[in-house]
Amino acid sequence: VQWMGFDGNAHNHNNGDVDIGRLSVMAGLNVRDGEAILNPFLGKSFALAAVTTNYELNVDKPLSASSKNGRGIGYWLGMGSAVPGIEWGRREKRATHLSAYPLETVKKVERPTTIILDDEVPQVPKRAEFFARAEAGDLGEKSRVERGRFAFKHPFAMSMVSLIKRMVPEQDGQVYKEKVDNYNDPGANAKALKSISYLLGSEMTGICEIPRYAWYSNRKDGSEIPYKHKYAVVMLVDQGYETMEGASGDDFISGAQSMRAYMRGAEIAGVMAEHLRSNGFSSRAQTNADSDVVHIPLVLWAGLGELSRIGELVLNPFIGPRLKTVVMTTNMPLEVDKPIDFGLQKFCSSCLK
């Protein structure tokens, strides 16, 4: 809202100038039940936040007092483009370390389906990133000039950029000296981290050991990047099917989709890394804003997809290329996942296009 030129302030339960509960009733989100506030679909299981602004908006009407229970037949069947209630029921029955998608049913293999000659793959410095090369003028003057005009192009996307940048200092930090002793089971640790990732908003999560070539060799200033972690927890963030299907291709909404996924990914990995550091395990969030590792090989080894022919992109069997990645590297003992084979290489090798 501020990027569009209007005043706007955020409010939550702990920090705000308004009665958010009352506003939620007036805005048609909740109804009062005595002293309690209920949502027709969520009951009491929600938190509230609000934005106040002078941006002129149409107002919603309060809900009828009879709207306390919205879980009728329409809810369970998903009428009105909502996720069906029966689908929520299915997800609730799955173990917490499993995603909403049945990734565990996909065929597992010992190595990624794209040939990787481990001893021949060189490490590259962060200066070799194409964004960095364009910025330095390696790709010509036009690319150097246009590098600064990134694909935000939308107030919604721009509003998330500052938050993404502000989380960078929190990606790494002090490790508490007293390591907790009851984290010696790699399998239990892996399940716990996956459960946390899904609670925080990851779509799918996999774990792998970090190969040598997945580490950048040097930072942009020339300093060496140490290989201080053994494991990578790799997470996919869905960019949104409905938004992608509704985009025209020239409305710049894809920039907002990217920034939202990057912002959420940085939050998820940042919280998880801080949690592990507080338990004595060195951990770091590796995000789009600052990463010491190359994500593509880690996504392959963590069993989250196969390398496609859409440029340098890993295709997931359930959400395709509609994803952004975030990684948390750590030394906590973890059980690793295997790469997957859902037939992509066979399909592409049979293509006549």
For each feature predicted by the language model, list its residue ranges:
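Catalytic cores of enzyme domains
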Residues: 1-70, 194, 203-353
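Iron-sulfur (Fe-S) cluster-binding modules
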Residues: 65-208, 229
